[in-house]
Amino acid sequence: MTETMTMPADSVERALIPILSADEVHTVAEHALDEARQRIAEIESVAIGDVTSENVLDAWDRAAIVIEDAFGPISILNSVHPEKSVRDAGDDALIAESSFMTDLFQSERFYERVRAVVPASSAQKQLRKDLIEAFEDSGVALPPEKRERFKTISDRLTELGQEFAKNVRENATRLTFTPAECEGLPQPWLDRVPRDEAGNVVVGFDYPDCVPFMMNARDEAARKRYYVGNTNRGTERNIAILDEIVALRKEIADLYDVPSFAHYVTKRRMVENPETVRRFLDEVRSRVTEAEIRDLGQLSEVKSAMSGIPLDQANISRWDVNFYRERLREQRFAIDQEALRQYFPTKASVDWMLDVSERLYGVRFERRSTSSVGCQLSVVSCQQPATDNSLNRQPTTDNRQPIPVWHDSVLYYDVLDSSDGTHIGGIYLDLYPRDGKYKHAAAWPVRGVSTKSGRQPISVLVTNLNGEGLTHDELETLLHEFGHVLHGVLSKTEYLQHSGTSVERDFVEAPSQMYEEWASRMESLSLMREHCGECPLIEQELVDRLVSATKFGAGIDYGRQLLYAAFDMELSSEHPRGCVEVWREMEGATPMGHVEGTAFPGTFEHIASGYAAGYYGYMWAKVIALDMVSAFGADLMNGETGRRFRELILSRGSEEPARELVEGFLGRAVSSEAFFARIQGE
């Protein structure tokens, strides 16, 4: 159930996200599943001899649209709606959807009819292949007992994944620090955070609290206490959940008679098998270990100089990294992340991001006025900017009806093709932290495109930005997630199943990682001035220092990514062990060692959900991303290249394998040269 709205004096009928109550979530979910069952039954009733692409593939596309029209909106409301009752209803609905989808892809009658299709186009051929693989990965070809066990496991994994994410999202733990423990923190941060009756600072774990604290608090004991609390926010329950998830995944591998869950998963990805992943991680390890040790040595020098500790005793702990890296950046590159917020005011940065995207991809974003409905906004705090320094991107003030949103801080934009004004789709931006909201930054492809059905896309950007301005790191994150949004809303695929980010898991991060580079180039950053007349001028000398400061610490950063990826693969291996035991052992083998009393696996939402045996994909995709940047040459704002990227990569979704799309864009095979140079800080 996706709402549509035609505005007065506006000929566009746009799809919108319905703002549902808890009762409506249940009703919408039930009705959608009932209608989908009827549509699937019609497909199953087609005689094998009468099968065509129209009565099977096209009919499936229409059934998939019914499902997504309901569960796309439910999925985003489940993660961001201010009312807990709606989020809880979303948990139940998404579990029901997952169970339905497993049943659907275990239907032998449906499977037989898909196999009987004779495709007449490349898109039909790819959809037929994708559907057959989805059936086979859901157990349709397994013996009945194994098929039923797969169904039970799949349902349980969905329940566990939902509970894991909920435990992190709704953990309201706060830590209290004395004013002395907060020495070094910027005054705007101190003015913003709440205090208890004794005047102590009360800090949660949202990004706007966490990042400044770990970068600036001079008290090492305070940083350690915050680091431990943040690392343990997943609770002991999540450790038990993850161990059960790992065991169930291994059982799936056993049902398919393959050595490991990694074998079961990677066969559908660019790497094709876990051996390729391990070789890739080994190559990263051979390059990154020395770089990480070198970076830590430089931080030790800073710690020794600042604290008076002898260099051989100035060991860097995990709660030291961000603090001393910032001091090194200040000393060596004259870069102060907190001071950078004046260059990147939050609202102006969002406007700049939209402007850059317009120029690159030949689109236009038109902001519409919005109206929050269906939630008690008076009891929901949200860290919005106190002032608006942006020069444009104000909402329209004509007689068009406001767009309904779930919170009064949420923005909505129509997306138009700049060449002819054609309406392409819509995007929602939910930018600021609040209680109960998803804690990280992510994009939701709420509504995928289907040119076959005349369907337009909707994407949602969810972040937890500091309302008073962004650091350079936060600007990169904003661009990264908006890269996912663009991948969704600029998709132009024939079938819904191929739309947007529905690509191989180890490719999905590449377009968004590529977009991060626009945060570090003069030709793009110079445009910030057009969106904030009061901001300091960004000059080439500053950009050069930003780039140098960003490159420092690459060994530490990629060393951590390597640890995450290797940990994920170990949990998906032939003989998985308890997650805490594995983590203690693997983190303990790194240069900084394991921090006793911490349980990071309980917060690792990626591997509790769709990224299992897939976290390596962040680095694998980075190889592709940095190579694709090379196609822009010396000018990242080259609109001709940007529109080629839109046409050859973003618009195609998964209508072709990712490798073929990338090689078509580059005109050659992918090279890892730029990636390994980045690891070395070059």
Named regions from a protein language model:
Residues 302-306, 370-388, 392-403:
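Short, basic, low-complexity termini and linkers enriched in Ser/Thr/Gly/Pro
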Residues 10-24, 73-93, 116-152, 202-239, ...:
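Short His/Asp/Glu-rich catalytic/ion-coordination signatures at enzyme active sites or charged loops
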Residues 65-76, 133, 228, 321-327, ...:
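Short, hydrophobic/amphipathic alpha-helical patches that form generic packing surfaces
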Residues 465-479:
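Short pre-active-site segment immediately N-terminal to the catalytic Zn-binding motif
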Residues 2-27, 31, 200, 348, ...:
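C-terminal, non-catalytic "cap/extension" segments appended to globular domains
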Residues 2-185:
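N-terminal helix-rich structural modules
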Residues 123, 127-129, 156-159, 166, ...:
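Active-site-proximal, well-structured secondary-structure segments within enzyme catalytic domains
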Residues 236, 272, 344, 469-473, ...:
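Alpha-helix capping and helix-loop boundary segments enriched in small/acidic/polar residues
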